[in-house]
Each structure stands twice: as structure tokens, then as C-alpha cells.
């Protein structure tokens, strides 16, 4: 039986005649909110907000309760009915290919990030958070805006809306006022309209979205991270490979902070071969892997993602990982980790199309680079990793 995941607006779960299919084998669908409906909701909010009771004072305590419910509770998620924590993880696997160990890890990261962040001063803004589909850890921004704003509109990814819907249900169950949160699944063109309709906006997306969305006041755009790692001359090959492996493979390569580019001051091939051998040990058929991989649920998506690497390779570049680019096991489709050693173009040339290329699986390109070339690429990266130090944020994503 096909189910419809509802929107949440005007204080209640709401179906829609405008729907889109959810990825996965269940055949479920997602209710979409047209821009004209969102515009009417903004007008309603402007008239309603002055007369609402104040938002809860102890927001941090409420958010921590909501995270407990998000992770473990049985919640009424609109259109899907009561959903336990275990059923949520099963649904993530079936629809988005997110394995249980990653879901557990990401839930823990949400709590850690919330507890570490200073409590903001609340204001009267209507905030928008437009989420990506690669990881639900970006729900930390929803929590941040709930703690800060008068109300929050959440626009989930159509590829993975389940986590956003469950967080809205958890907020409601923890006592957050229903008029102060909304879930607006929309078609992509409606995003611009949602930005116009709200006061503060946090938008996640890749390079195409970053180019398409204008930058009005109040917009924070989280685009490509272009994360890179700089390996100094003299660092032992085995030590460098051990250091780099988790930077590339953790979280199935889905974070904007996962390293995609490795620039080494020493010979590149020994390091690239050692790293490729380590990546080849990541087997999607192994359920207890240290580095679990996500499965691809959209037909052809894994092939498109891996092809985007092959199409950017230049003469002289070599793919050193040996597994097939895409494997199917138990009916599940995976993109296997990729490691490319760039050829004899200018060392570490920042214009090489593979340097900084982001895909939703573990991938990195290794190049030898002079110090000036490495620093030139690092200046274009949001995350720069050096041995024995934390990631450095090199530029403001705004």
C-alpha cells in the first residue's frame, strides 16, 4: 500500500494533490507544497504571530528532549503513522540507503553539536532551512534556528525527507508550539520563492544550486566544501595513508568536509597506491565494516556518480582502486570507493576537474604539488586538513 508523507503547515500535518515519488522500494510518495500556498501561509503568519503565546523559554532543554525522541521515541509522523526509532532506521535504509551504523553515528553527532554550541539570543525572525539529501546531520541547523527564531520553515530534500519529518514530529512531541514550525517539501524552483518569503535563510546544496540561488541579505549558503589534505615532504607513506583513510571514507564520503583532493609535496604514486589499497578493503557486502557505505536507491544514480569521475579524468590520470565502479549485492546498489592519481600536468594544478570534485561516495584525487600550487588550491577550499591538526575553515561560506 502506497503511503503519502505529509507536509506540516498551519499547525497540522497536511496532504497534497501535488506529490513526488520517494526513492526506494516501498513506493511511498511525498506531499509537495506549491509556492502560492507558502505565500498564503506567510501572510497568515504575519497576522497570527503577534497574538501567539511566547515561545518556550528553556529551548535548549526542549531540543535535547526532542533529540531523545528523534533517536528512540515512537512518534506520529504525518501520513506514515506511529514510527519507532527502529522503524525510522529501517525506513532510512529502505528509502535512502543509509545503513544503521551511520544513522546511529549521525544521531550522536546531532546531540554533540547541539550541546557544544552556545545558546543564541532569540529573535522574531521567520527562518528557512533548506536541507540536503546526503546526510541528516544538517538537521543541526534546524535545531539552531528553532533555538534562535520565532518560527522555522523546514524544506527537506526530496531524496531524503524522512529525517526532517521525524524531527518535526519530535519537536512537537517535546512541546514545541505547532504554529512555530512547518515542513515544506517543494519542487526545486519553489526554493527561490521560499527564500523571498522568509526573513533568514540557510540553504544547503552543491555547486549547481550555489550558482542558481541569488544571495540576498540574510542568506547563508552551504555549498561545496572542496575539502583537501596537504601531505608534507618526508611524511611516511603508511602514516599518511592511515591519516587520510578516515578523512576520505568516514560517513560514506557524504559530508562536505570529506577530503576529495590530496596534495603531496613528495612522490605521489606510492601514497596513492597505499591509499587505493586501503580503500579497496571497504567492501559493501560486509555489514560490520568500519567504514559502512550507503546504498543508492534512485535508478542510475550510482552509475551517474561514478561516471562523473571517469569523465573528468585526463590523459595520464589513473584509477588505482580495483573494484568495479558500481556493485550490486543483495539487491542493493553501491558506488565503490575511487582513488585517482593525476598525471603529469602542472603539479597540483587547481584547474584540474577532479580536484575538489564532490560525489556521494568515498573518492579522492592525489596529485603532487609545489607549495605555491597547494596553497592556491587550499585558498579555494572550505576545509583544509594538515597532519596532526584539526580542519581549518579557510573562508566564510556566506
Q: Which residues fall in each region the model found?
A:
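A short, well-structured beta->alpha microelement
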Residues: 107-108, 112, 180, 369-373
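Short glycine-enriched loop/turn motifs at secondary-structure junctions
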Residues: 25-29, 194-196, 223-225, 255-258, ...
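ALDH superfamily catalytic-core signature
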Residues: 173-177, 199-200, 209-348
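Conserved C-terminal structural/oligomerization subdomain of aldehyde/semialdehyde dehydrogenase
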Residues: 21-38, 42, 47, 54-68, ...
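N-terminal Rossmann-like NAD(P)+-binding subdomain of aldehyde/semialdehyde dehydrogenases
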Residues: 1-122
Amino acid at each position: 500500500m502506497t503511503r503519502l508523507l505529509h507536509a506540516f503547515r498551519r499547525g497540522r500535518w497536511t496532504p497534497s494533490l501535488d506529490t513526488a515519488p520517494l526513492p526506494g522500494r516501498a513506493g511511498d510518495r511525498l506531499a509537495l507544497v506549491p509556492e502560492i500556498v507558502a505565500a498564503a501561509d506567510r501572510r497568515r503568519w504575519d497576522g497570527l504571530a503577534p497574538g501567539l503565546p511566547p515561545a518556550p523559554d528553556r529551548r535548549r532543554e526542549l531540543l535535547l528532549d526532542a533529540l531523545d525522541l528523534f533517536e528512540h521515541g515512537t512518534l506520529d509522523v504525518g501520513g506514515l503513522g506511529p514510527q519507532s526509532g527502529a522503524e525510522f532506521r529501517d525506513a532510512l535504509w529502505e528509502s535512502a540507503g543509509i545503513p544503521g551504523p551511520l544513522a546511529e553515528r549521525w544521531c550522536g553527532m546531532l546531540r554533540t553539536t547541539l550541546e557544544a554550541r552556545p545558546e543564541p539570543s532569540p529573535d522574531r525572525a521567520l527562518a528557512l532551512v533548506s536541507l540536503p539529501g546526503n546526510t541528516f546531520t544538517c538537521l543541526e541547523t534546524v535545531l539552531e534556528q528553532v533555538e534562535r527564531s520565532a518560527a522555522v520553515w523546514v524544506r527537506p530534500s526530496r531524496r531524503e525527507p524522512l529525517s526532517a519529518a521525524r524531527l518535526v514530529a519530535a519537536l512537537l512531541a517535546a512541546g514545541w508550539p505547532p504554529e512555530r514550525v512547518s515542513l515544506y517539501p517543494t519542487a526545486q524552483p519553489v526554493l527561490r520563492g521560499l527564500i523571498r518569503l522568509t526573513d533568514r535563510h540557510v540553504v544547503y546544496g552543491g555547486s549547481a544550486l550555489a550558482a542558481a540561488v541569488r544571495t540576498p541579505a540574510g542568506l547563508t549558503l552551504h555549498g561545496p566544501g572542496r575539502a583537501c589534505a596537504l601531505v608534507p615532504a618526508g611524511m611516511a607513506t603508511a602514516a599518511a595513508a592511515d591519516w587520510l583513510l578516515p578523512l576520505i571514507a568516514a560517513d560514506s564520503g557524504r559530508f562536505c568536509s570529506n577530503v576529495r583532493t590530496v596534495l603531496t609535496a613528495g612522490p605521489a604514486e606510492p601514497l596513492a597506491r597505499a591509499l587505493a589499497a586501503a580503500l579497496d578493503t571497504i567492501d559493501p557486502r560486509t555489514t560490520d565494516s568500519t567504514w559502512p557505505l550507503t546504498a543508492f536507491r534512485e535508478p542510475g544514480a550510482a552509475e551517474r556518480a561514478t561516471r562523473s569521475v571517469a569523465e573528468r579524468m585526463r590523459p595520464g590520470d589513473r584509477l588505482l582502486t580495483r573494484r568495479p565502479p558500481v556493485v550490486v549485492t543483495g539487491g542493493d546498489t553501491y558506488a565503490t570507493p575511487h582513488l585517482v592519481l593525476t598525471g603529469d600536468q602542472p603539479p597540483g594544478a587547481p584547474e584540474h576537474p577532479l580536484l575538489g570534485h564532490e560525489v556521494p561516495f568515498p573518492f579522492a584525487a592525489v596529485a603532487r604539488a609545489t607549495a605555491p600550487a597547494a596553497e592556491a588550491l587550499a585558498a579555494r577550499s572550505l576545509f583544509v586538513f594538515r597532519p596532526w591538526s584539526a580542519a581549518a575553515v579557510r573562508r566564510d561560506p556566506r
